Amino acid sequence: LGMTSPDSGSISVFGHAGCSAKDREDIGVVFDELPFAQTLFISHLGRIMKGIYQNWDQKQYEEYLQKFALPDRKELKDFSRGMKMKLSLAVALSHNAKLLILDEPTSGLDPVVRAEILDIFLDFISDGEHSVLVSSHITSDLEKVADYITFIHQGKLMLCENKDNIIYGYGIAKADKATIDAIDSQFVLKKKHGKYDSEALVIDRAAFSRQYPEILVDPINLDELMLMLCSDK
């Protein structure tokens, strides 16, 4: 988006390096906080966006406002968090974006609004021509809508994996320390030793169970996975 420069590494957008003005036309962004002037009305905002985006679709914007039941006689400062998030989505979805980038879009929302927003994401990507990049700490939401999980901890990339591989393939093996330490490293991503027992983060629990039928291995959810990867024991 041109808001900051990387310290290292590289990034490609739509298959090429960098992000041109044309690329930014194809990206819809939803920040954690509403980035618009708080004294605006939603009708004013539509006129402003029309002057910013070449592909602005006013009719689509108005349809989203109606769908989200957003009030047209309130200033933005009087909107609830859920209403502000819906408005940000309405803007992001009304200029024919191919990619949505969202920062904590469901944080602080009630379950009904969260479910509604997740359904919007699923509908957006349903044609296979659109993508959504979500930054979120709500792992249950990621389990519902994500295809891939990228976990970054303290600026370090800890994991980038297909979500289904994690849910249906990864697991936690539990046993005494000697048993866990004896497991072949090809099966293990991380080991953790506690006071009374030890655990291993297993990459392929089906293959692991064939190799070690005597060791119990359970499925793992995203919360458990992230806690395991962050463990320093």
PLM-predicted stretches and their roles:
Residues 1:
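Helix-to-loop junction immediately C-terminal to a conserved catalytic motif
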Residues 9-23:
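Conserved ABC transporter NBD signature motif
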Residues 25, 31-87:
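ABC-family P-loop ATPase nucleotide-binding domains
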Residues 100-104:
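Catalytic Walker B motif of ABC-type/P-loop ATPase nucleotide-binding domains
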Residues 106-107, 139:
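Short loop immediately C-terminal to the Walker-B catalytic DE motif
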Residues 118-202:
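ABC transporter nucleotide-binding domain
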Residues 188-233:
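C-terminal coupling/interaction segments
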